[in-house]
């Protein structure tokens, strides 16, 4: 969920960040981040020429963080390693303060996948455990995306929020979750790929 930054510092001075409460019942509790378009060639991340990074506020030192680049059109919860292009691992080095964790290439579960056109980033905190820790994260930096917002210039005077390319306002609410979601019924009234979902 979107929440106030628990402790701004020089690493992450943002007013807001993501808050994630790990599900103790899940050994591999995953966060799926669907790119707003297919990813460009990710081979530089495999070779190490480019690095994935994420700002993390974690409860302990030594917690592994994993990113899996995935083709979500073929990957399902039960068919590992199909659809999992490559995995990257980083480890926390401080507790209860922001740090930038760098993730390095750790293998290719499904080497048959192309380096071009990956659709999703799967983010795992402390995988292969059953813990219920709380994490905060922000500023995920990784593969470039061939998305519809490339070259888009926002006009905040007329485009407040369309959940695709315009993000010009913040929302305050008392309960529930407000998320970006796939448009459930694309049509002539609303042709957007994404919309808001409130539960």
Question: Model-found features: residue ranges?
Answer:
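Beta-rich carbohydrate-recognition modules and glycan-binding surfaces
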Residues: 1-199
């Amino acid at each position: 969920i979107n929440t106030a930054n628990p402790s701004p510092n020089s690493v992450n001075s943002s007013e807001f960040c993501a808050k994630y409460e790990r599900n103790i019942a899940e050994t591999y509790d995953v966060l799926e981040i669907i790119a707003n378009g297919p990813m460009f060639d990710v081979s530089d991340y495999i070779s190490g020429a480019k690095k994935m990074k994420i700002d993390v506020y974690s409860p302990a030192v030594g917690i592994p963080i994993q990113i899996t680049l995935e083709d979500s059109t073929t990957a399902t919860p039960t068919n590992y390693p199909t659809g999992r292009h490559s995995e990257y691992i980083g480890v926390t080095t401080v507790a209860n303060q922001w740090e930038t964790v760098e993730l390095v290439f750790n293998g290719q579960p499904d080497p048959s996948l192309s380096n071009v056109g990956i659709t999703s980033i799967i983010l795992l905190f402390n995988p292969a455990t059953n813990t219920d820790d709380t994490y905060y994260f922000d500023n995920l930096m990784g593969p470039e995306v061939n998305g519809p917002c490339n070259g888009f210039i926002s006009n905040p005077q007329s485009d407040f929020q369309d959940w695709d390319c315009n993000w010009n306002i913040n929302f305050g609410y008392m309960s529930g979750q407000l998320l970006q979601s796939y448009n459930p019924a694309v049509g002539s009234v609303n042709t957007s790929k994404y919309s808001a979902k409130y539960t």
